[in-house]
């Protein structure tokens, strides 16, 4: 299992477009991929699950991966967060 922490850097937070990018990236991996906010863990391969986190700018998110390509999956998801989803950063 790999656990990484990141912070929402884009001003708009996690809305439909970033949720889709996260899910599309997570689906590429065989590992289970989860996002966790304040103890609420969701499946990162589910756009609706990601949206329900209601993660706004500055929110801390934990990325959790389990499986054969867990390190690559965690790093790919973290890279999306670090890029601010190519949106306006705060």
Label the predicted regions:
Residues 1-5, 60-62:
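Intrinsic-disorder/low-complexity, polar/charged segments enriched in Ser/Thr/Lys/Arg/Asp/Glu/Gln
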Residues 7-57, 80:
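Compact, glycine-rich, soluble single-domain proteins
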Residues 56-90:
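C-terminal structural segments of small proteins and small subunits
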